[in-house]
């Protein structure tokens, strides 16, 4: 008869550190054709800004060339950029929304 071997049970814990997702700034860029009221509408509709917040961001866009609408994980930022650009084109405005790593 064979000899019964020792069975050793090894339990290994693997601890992985969950990294927070990379964050991205959603940016509206200035142009010479999109009305200021439309920019305010976009900020309220897509970024849930109050009229005062939207006006402040719109003025930053107008004077500084661009303004930050919000900071989001990549997937959300990418979706918001696509939605804003599509909405602008549907309304025949050249407003450009883009994203930058935060």
UniProtKB/Swiss-Prot annotation:
Q: Which Pfam families match?
A: ClpS
Q: Which InterPro entries match?
A: ClpS (IPR022935), ClpS_core (IPR003769), Ribosomal_bL12_C/ClpS-like (IPR014719)
Question: What biological process terms from GO does the record include?
Answer: protein catabolic process; proteolysis
Q: Which SUPFAM superfamilies match?
A: ClpS-like
What pairs make up the disulfide bonds?
none
Give the Gene3D superfamilies listed for this entry.
3.30.1390.10
Function of the molecule: Involved in the modulation of the specificity of the ClpAP-mediated ATP-dependent protein degradation.
Entry's HAMAP family?
ClpS (MF_00302)
What is stated as this protein's family in its record? Belongs to the ClpS family.
Q: How does it assemble?
A: Binds to the N-terminal domain of the chaperone ClpA.
Designated name of the protein: ATP-dependent Clp protease adapter protein ClpS
- Write the lineage as a comma-separated list: Bacteria, Pseudomonadati, Pseudomonadota, Gammaproteobacteria, Alteromonadales
**Gene name, please?**
clpS
């Amino acid at each position: 008869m064979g000899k019964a071997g020792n069975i050793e049970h090894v339990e290994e814990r693997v601890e992985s550190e969950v990294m927070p997702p990379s964050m991205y700034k959603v940016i509206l860029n200035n142009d010479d054709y999109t009305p200021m009221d439309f920019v305010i509408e976009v900020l309220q509709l897509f970024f849930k800004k109050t009229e005062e917040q939207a006006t402040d961001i719109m003025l930053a866009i107008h004077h500084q060339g661009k303004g930050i609408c919000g900071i989001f994980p990549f997937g959300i930022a990418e979706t918001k950029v696509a939605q804003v650009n599509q909405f602008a084109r549907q309304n025949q405005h050249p407003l450009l929304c883009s994203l930058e790593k935060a």
